[in-house]
């Protein structure tokens, strides 16, 4: 039986603690993008949503800095590995990974 790799598209949104410095927040964003690339993903779109008010306190924080990354990969383990990486990162207070359709990928303004 042959196993074919399927190209899939994903979106990840994550929130970091507001107590981090601007430099630390940007570094965290770069680390997540680099992790995706190292695991065989290709970044298609990225966006810094900035500081946002939370609907309810999370770890006693009322706001957090949000980031969005859309990527594609043939590595079926990448979403789970990214989920685990975000889970163990103490600076990340919330995250969400989900599969999207190719037509839902936003275009970076070049």
Swiss-Prot record:
GO terms for biological process: translation. Pfam families: Ribosomal_S6 (PF01250). Keywords: Ribonucleoprotein, Ribosomal protein, RNA-binding, rRNA-binding. InterPro entries: Ribosomal_bS6, Ribosomal_bS6_sf, Ribosomal_S6_plastid/chlpt, Transl_elong_EF1B/ribsomal_bS6. The keyword Cytoplasm does not apply. GO terms for cellular component: cytoplasm; ribonucleoprotein complex; ribosome. It comes from the Bacteria. GO terms for molecular function: small ribosomal subunit rRNA binding; structural constituent of ribosome. Disulfide bonds: none annotated. Gene3D superfamilies: 3.30.70.60. NCBIfam families: S6. Belongs to the bacterial ribosomal protein bS6 family. Binds together with bS18 to 16S ribosomal RNA. This is Small ribosomal subunit protein bS6. It comes from Aquifex aeolicus (strain VF5).
């Amino acid at each position: 039986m042959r196993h074919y790799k399927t190209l899939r598209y994903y979106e990840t949104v994550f929130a970091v603690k507001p107590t981090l410095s601007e430099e630390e927040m940007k570094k965290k964003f770069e680390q997540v993008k680099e992790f995706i690339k190292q695991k065989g993903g290709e970044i298609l779109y990225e966006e810094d949503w900035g500081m946002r008010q939370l609907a309810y306190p999370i770890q006693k924080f009322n706001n957090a800095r949000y980031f969005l990354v859309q990527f594609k990969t043939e590595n079926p383990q990448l979403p789970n590995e990214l989920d685990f990486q975000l889970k163990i990162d103490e600076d990340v207070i919330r995250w969400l990974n989900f599969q999207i359709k190719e037509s839902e990928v936003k275009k970076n303004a070049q």
